[in-house]
Amino acid sequence: MAKRSSLTRRGVSPRAAARARRHMRVRKKVRGTPERPRLVVTRSLKHIVAQIVDDTKGHTLVSASTLEASIRGEEGRKTEKSHLVGKVLAERAKAAGITAVVFDRAGYRYHGRVAALANGAREGGLEF
């Protein structure tokens, strides 16, 4: 029998395991500081969540999601809502005094909803 990785166990698809490996590889290099916190994106089939995290303290400073009532009520496709999440996140970050972030795509491809969120955050005034 072939040896299994700790990430390829029953119930986890090979695609999800590969994404988790990519995310771990990126997290070794990407660190958020108080001056330049980490913007991490989490995606599901229906929703997207973005958080700005200070890794030195382990605290979430600002977050935005399509699960919020104000964004959930908006009309449009998932990609358009992701763009809106990026803009809302940028507004909240500016209010908290955050202007520059390190983008952590969490192993997802920089395409579609992830790219739309990043573009929305840039339009809102965040610097990557």
Curated annotation (Swiss-Prot):
Amino acid composition bias (Basic residues), ranges on this chain: 18-31
Keyword Transmembrane helix: no
Region (Disordered): 1-36
Keyword set, alphabetical order: Ribonucleoprotein, Ribosomal protein, RNA-binding, rRNA-binding
GO CC terms: cytosolic large ribosomal subunit
Gene3D superfamilies noted in UniProt: 3.30.420.100
Molecular function via GO: 5S rRNA binding; structural constituent of ribosome
InterPro entries: Ribosomal_uL18_bac-type (IPR004389), Ribosomal_uL18_bac/euk (IPR005484)
Pfam families noted in UniProt: Ribosomal_L18p
Gene Ontology biological process: translation
UniProt similarity note: Belongs to the universal ribosomal protein uL18 family.
Assembly and oligomerization: Part of the 50S ribosomal subunit; part of the 5S rRNA/L5/L18/L25 subcomplex. Contacts the 5S and 23S rRNAs.
Free-text function comment from the UniProt entry: This is one of the proteins that bind and probably mediate the attachment of the 5S RNA into the large ribosomal subunit, where it forms part of the central protuberance.
Protein name: Large ribosomal subunit protein uL18
